């Protein structure tokens, strides 16, 4: 009906000036009319222009007064025509809100005499408020003074009305032609006889359910924010492929260490070796491995350059730390705080708690005269920001840190102490060959990203969190991460 009305009207008229007036004139629901207008516009039967008007609609209170009358009139009618009524008796006849507003407005209008007794001052009154509200419901316009009065009493609120003006489009016809909208086999076979609907490249498509952040990314952002709040700067960690030299040798890890075995490390076939290393630094590292130095006896073995040249997928982000500390040593010393959160790779058996690739969080501070007490203080500050205030430290061994400590936190839910990370002070055998001053110390700590994420989101199988088997619904539904709250 709406389509025939629009096309028929335009056949004899230049345009429809206002879709609202048109819908009222032809007794068509405006929402239905708008849908038909959009459809005809899509096929270019008509051209349209938007119309926006500020209209007024009744509030819930306004609707009530439009039906029952204004409070002042309700109060006036409750007062007897002759004589008077006590204020208490009058209050019993009316709702509390009606009585309160009615007293104010009726007194203001000088309709009643207010005291202990209430009596009428006029014989009859006209309920202008109710009349105005009813006319606003019908879409009629009012003078500014009346609108402001009703608005002040919170009986009406503004609303933007949207409609259209309509005129003939380039494809106008008194009757819509049937056009093919789907590229079916039958339609393609009869394409010469058919007219196809044009593509509307301006039309908005269905919202794409995308852009959800993975749980690991949310937790990673929280850790990054904590590091930044503590004054750390992020290290560049984009080189997944690293040489054995920076990954192992520069960290004073011997070449016969089990971690360097192919069973624990992914070595590259192409390119199998690195091209360039800082030769003077390589010589110092070789010397400290073979015969010691800087107060160390070394490992007393034949250090091989070909082992150091082998390329691999980095097994820890400490390889990045070694590069950054070496670069720092080549300039006049400046204290630094570094952190990184990125992927590392281990040639390990995959099970519900281990993957061949995972994420490592690492923080380090390089400054003069640092002690083990400084490390413990920083760790307590760092982990307290994660909501872990109960910490314990246990001596441990790492090839490149001495002393070394495992970090434990008391898990309230499990009711026991849980290992949450590793820490230590980088050895002089690692730092001094780089060229750092003798009084410079480096304290560092690290932990995985996956373990706290699994705890926060209640995941007990790491393969449900990371990898090709992750359920997309988990990514879409996982809540905002708030560490420490």
Curated annotation (Swiss-Prot):
Entry annotated with the keyword Chloroplast: no
One GO biological process term: phenylalanyl-tRNA aminoacylation
Cofactor names: Mg(2+)
Subunit structure: Tetramer of two alpha and two beta subunits.
Class in the EC hierarchy, top level: ligase
E.C. no: 6.1.1.20
Organism (species): Arabidopsis thaliana
CDD domains found in the cross-reference section: PheRS_alpha_core
Protein family: Belongs to the class-II aminoacyl-tRNA synthetase family. Phe-tRNA synthetase alpha subunit type 2 subfamily.
Catalytic activity: tRNA(Phe) + L-phenylalanine + ATP = L-phenylalanyl-tRNA(Phe) + AMP + diphosphate + H(+)
Any single Gene Ontology cellular-component annotation: cytosol
Pfam families: PheRS_DBD1, PheRS_DBD3, tRNA-synt_2d
Keywords, ordered alphabetically: Aminoacyl-tRNA synthetase, ATP-binding, Cytoplasm, Ligase, Magnesium, Metal-binding, Nucleotide-binding, Protein biosynthesis
UniProt binding sites for L-phenylalanine: 318, 360-362, 400, 426
Residues reported to bind Mg(2+): 402
Top-level taxon of the source organism: Eukaryota
InterPro entries: aa-tRNA-synth_II, aa-tRNA-synth_II/BPL/LPL, Phe-tRNA-synth_IIc_asu, Phenylalanyl-tRNA_Synthase, PheRS_DBD1, PheRS_DBD3
Localisation: Cytoplasm, Cytosol
One GO MF term attached to the UniProt entry: ATP binding
Name the record gives this protein: Phenylalanine--tRNA ligase alpha subunit, cytoplasmic
Taxonomic path: Eukaryota, Viridiplantae, Streptophyta, Embryophyta, Tracheophyta
PANTHER family for the chain: PHENYLALANINE--TRNA LIGASE ALPHA SUBUNIT, PHENYLALANYL-TRNA SYNTHETASE
């Amino acid at each position: 009906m709406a389509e025939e009305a629009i096309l028929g009207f335009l056949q004899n008229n230049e345009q429809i000036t206002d879709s609202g007036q048109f819908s009222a004139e032809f007794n068509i629901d405006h929402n239905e009319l708008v849908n038909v207008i959009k459809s005809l516009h899509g096929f270019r039967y008509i051209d349209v222009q938007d119309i926006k008007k500020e209209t007024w609609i009744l509030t819930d209170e306004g609707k009530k007064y439009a039906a029952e009358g204004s409070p002042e009139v309700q109060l006036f009618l409750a007062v007897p025509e002759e004589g008077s009524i006590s204020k208490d008796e009058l209050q019993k006849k009316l709702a509390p809100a009606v009585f309160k507003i009615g007293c104010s407005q009726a007194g203001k209008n000088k309709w009643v005499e207010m005291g202990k007794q209430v009596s009428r001052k006029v014989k009859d009154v006209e309920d202008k408020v109710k009349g105005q509200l009813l006319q606003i419901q019908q879409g009629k316009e009012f003078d500014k003074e009346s609108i402001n009065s009703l608005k002040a009493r919170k009986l009406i609120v503004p609303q933007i009305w949207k409609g259209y003006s309509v005129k003939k489009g380039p494809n106008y016809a008194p009757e819509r032609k049937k056009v093919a909208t789907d590229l079916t086999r039958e339609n393609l076979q009869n394409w010469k006889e058919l007219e196809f609907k044009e593509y509307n490249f301006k039309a908005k498509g269905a919202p794409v359910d995308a852009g959800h952040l993975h749980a690991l990314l949310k937790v990673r952002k929280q850790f990054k924010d904590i590091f930044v709040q503590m004054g750390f700067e992020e290290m560049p960690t984009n080189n997944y492929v690293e040489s054995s030299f920076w990954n192992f040798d520069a960290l004073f890890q011997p070449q016969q260490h089990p971690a360097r075995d192919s069973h624990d490390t992914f070595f590259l076939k192409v390119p199998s070796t690195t091209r360039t290393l800082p030769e003077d630094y390589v010589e110092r590292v070789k010397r400290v491995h073979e015969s010691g130095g800087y107060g160390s006896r070394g490992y007393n073995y034949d250090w091989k350059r070909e082992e150091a040249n082998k390329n691999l997928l980095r097994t820890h982000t400490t390889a990045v730390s070694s590069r950054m500390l070496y670069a720092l040593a080549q300039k006049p010393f400046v204290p630094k705080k570094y952190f990184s959160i990125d992927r590392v790779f281990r040639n390990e058996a995959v099970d519900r708690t281990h993957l061949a690739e995972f994420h490592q969080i690492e923080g380090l501070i390089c400054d003069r005269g640092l002690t083990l007490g400084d490390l413990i203080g920083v760790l307590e500050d760092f982990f307290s920001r994660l909501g872990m205030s109960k910490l314990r430290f246990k001596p441990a061994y790492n090839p490149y840190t001495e002393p070394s400590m495992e970090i434990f936190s008391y898990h309230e839910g499990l009711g026991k102490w849980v290992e949450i990370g590793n820490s230590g002070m980088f050895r002089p055998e690692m730092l001094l060959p780089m060229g750092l001053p003798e009084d410079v110390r480096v304290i560092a700590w690290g932990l995985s990203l996956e373990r706290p994420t699994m705890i926060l989101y209640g995941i007990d199988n790491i393969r449900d969190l990371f990898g090709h088997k992750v359920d997309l619904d988990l990514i879409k539904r996982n809540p905002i991460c708030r560490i420490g709250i």
